[in-house]
């Protein structure tokens, strides 16, 4: 969640599943001793270019997804998905909430998420994803704070031909 706790860093349009484990989780998660939130994102559209735009008094977002190589039966394919959110609570607050802190809610955030997925005809796949989440708090008379979370990652599934073994990572 962002600095004021009302907005998630994850765009719900990119989520495939979210699982929360408070105890008793498997070795799949390493030696964790605390709770785990396992977030899985979906792949982009494999057949058509598609998008979504949304705006509210607090934020706006867009999502764009589509094939890099269109899906065909028994052939490899690839897709992309990108999502961006931006808040303008700092700008809209004086009009919507003039009674709160003299109309000043000095919070802004932005979220960027992207994922590329490549699928082979035989079932193997690899995904490369990245994110950039930013928060800013600007109390004009006293202090300003800003922080960023960035990350890159990969996930793969290897299905060797003629083998009963699957390699996942």
Where are these regions (language model features)?
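Outer-membrane beta-barrel proteins
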Residues: 89-95, 135-141
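Helix-turn-helix DNA-binding segment
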Residues: 18
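Transmembrane beta-barrel wall of Gram-negative outer-membrane proteins
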Residues: 58-86, 99-136, 145-168
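Histidine-centered metal-chelating micro-motifs
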Residues: 24-26, 60-62, 89
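Transmembrane beta-barrel architecture of outer-membrane proteins
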Residues: 5, 15, 32-34, 48, ...
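Flexible, glycine/serine/threonine-rich loop segments and coil->beta-strand junctions
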Residues: 1-13, 21-36, 45-49
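Short active-site oxyanion
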Residues: 48-52, 79
């Amino acid at each position: 969640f962002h600095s004021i706790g009302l907005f998630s860093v994850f765009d719900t349009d990119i989520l495939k599943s979210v699982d929360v484990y408070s105890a008793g989780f498997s070795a799949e998660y390493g030696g964790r001793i605390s709770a785990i939130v396992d977030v899985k994102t979906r792949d982009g559209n494999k057949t058509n270019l598609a998008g979504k735009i949304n705006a509210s008094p607090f934020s706006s977002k867009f999502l764009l997804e589509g094939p890099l190589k269109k899906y065909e039966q028994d052939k490899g394919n690839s897709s992309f998905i990108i999502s961006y959110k931006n808040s303008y609570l700092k700008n809209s607050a004086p009009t919507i909430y003039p009674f709160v802190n003299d109309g000043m809610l000095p919070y802004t955030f932005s979220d960027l998420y992207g994922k590329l997925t490549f699928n082979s005809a035989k079932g193997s796949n690899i995904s490369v994803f990245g994110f950039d989440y930013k928060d800013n708090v600007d109390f004009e008379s006293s202090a300003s704070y800003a922080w960023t979370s960035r990350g890159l990652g990969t996930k793969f599934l290897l299905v060797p031909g003629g083998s009963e073994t699957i390699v996942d990572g």
